[in-house]
Regions:
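Glycine-rich His-Gly loop
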Residues: 1-5, 65-66, 91, 176
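Conserved alpha/beta-hydrolase catalytic His-Asp/Glu region
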Residues: 121-165
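Conserved alpha/beta-hydrolase fold motif
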Residues: 62-63, 86, 173
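Conserved serine/cysteine hydrolase catalytic core
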Residues: 53, 144, 151-213, 219-223
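Conserved HGGG/HGGXW glycine-rich cap/lid loop of the alpha/beta-hydrolase fold
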Residues: 1-34
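Active-site loop/oxyanion-hole signature of alpha/beta-hydrolase fold enzymes
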Residues: 24-61, 77, 101-109
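Gly/Ala-rich beta-loop-alpha elbow adjacent to hydrolase catalytic centers
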Residues: 63-72
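Flexible "cap/lid" loop of the alpha/beta hydrolase fold
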Residues: 77-120, 155-157, 188, 227-229
Length: 230
């Protein structure tokens, strides 16, 4: 599951790398669900509709990158038989009933409110100067694909309470960047298996093979045999 602030291009190379390792993968495009409030309700409903239409079978494990992490329990809750497990990929952990605004420094929300226009956030790469994509993604074509896919999300989304859904099943964590040191530590404190890579937040797109290896290692630790990956 890609971040609500990005699109499938941020994960497509990782999906390909996982497929090379024998993991069946599906990437959903969640962008149409994040352009108008209430975003959480629309996101979860759209996820349920798309996965039902896809007629997916077998044990399913959800991987959430970045801002998709806190939503994984709600996505998993839409499956009639539940999800086999969750993997948080350089992502925030679930905070049921709390908003994005509740979990970040006040000055970050204030900055985003200042750069928003007509109630809409700019694309993710325009939140700050300089453009983080220039530093993180050297390949111009890939950088353009990621930039073009980034949606303009309503500022109100940041204040919406996240779905009040808990998760007590198998879970794991892959840390890619320093921004998620605390989340990885919290996951470890919960007893989850954790893998830490010397990478960056968009290594899912720029250097996917080590990320795929880390995920497969987690699957091996969490399941025998591994579940299919969604």
């Amino acid at each position: 599951m890609h971040s609500p602030f990005l699109g499938p291009a941020s994960l497509r190379p990782l999906a390909d790398a996982l497929a090379e390792r024998g993991q069946q993968t599906v990437i959903l495009d969640l962008r149409p669900s994040v352009v108008a409030p209430p975003v959480h309700q629309t996101l979860v409903g759209s996820f349920a509709d798309v996965t039902a239409d896809a007629a997916l079978s077998g044990p399913l494990l959800l991987i959430g990158h970045s801002g998709a992490g806190p939503l994984l329990p709600a996505f998993a809750d839409t499956f009639e038989e539940g999800a086999a497990g969750l993997i948080f990929l350089d992502a925030g952990l679930p905070t049921p009933g709390r908003s994005w605004r509740d979990t970040v420094p006040a000055d970050l929300y204030s900055h985003l409110r200042l750069v928003s226009r007509d109630g809409q956030l700019p694309r993710w790469q325009q939140w700050f100067t300089p453009d983080p994509l220039v530093e993180l993604v050297a390949d111009e074509q890939l950088r353009a694909e990621i930039a073009d896919e980034a949606p303009e999300v309503p500022l109100a989304f940041l204040k919406e309470a996240r779905p009040d859904v808990e998760w007590d099943g198998p879970a794991g964590y892959v840390q890619l960047s320093e921004s998620y040191v605390d989340d990885a530590a919290a996951a470890e404190a919960l007893g989850w298996p954790v893998r830490r890579l010397d990478a960056h937040h968009l290594a899912t797109a720029t250097d996917p093979k080590p990320v795929a290896n880390a995920i497969v290692e987690l699957l091996t630790e969490m399941f025998t045999p591994p579940a299919s990956v969604l």
